[in-house]
Amino acid sequence: MATFLCLPSLWAQGNQYLMAEAPQKLVAKRGTSVEAKIAVSIEPNFHVNSNTPSDAYLIPLKLTWTAGGALEPGEVVFPKARMEKYEFSDKPLSVYSGDFDLVAKFKVPAGAPQGPGIMVGKLRYQACNNNSCFPPKTAEVRLSYSVQ
């Protein structure tokens, strides 16, 4: 299984509580599977609900990819969340804070066209501080790739 070539990429745009950084370029071979590590950074004193929030009314962290391009999106692997108690909730919540990584998996079909491309992802999240939660936001993640 191929992995990613790391370092700078495009950060999520806008006045956000979260930034997401994809590898600089993913190199993929036809007929294989590849993984891209997406580095996520949450502003200090904030957290986001995990991909499996504690209550149904909370909005989960979710990464989706726009259809198109040579790569076929697969599973997204999330880190283990922490259970934290906050003033605005009667029970602990499943959250992420600080810096962590998501791993996005892709299949590269045997007939995929060779050459460069860009996958566009949307990372939806609900940010909270110690007192309250805010309306959900979406950060764009752009993943450059090259099929060989």
Name these PLM-found stretches:
Residues 1-9:
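Bacterial N-terminal signal peptides
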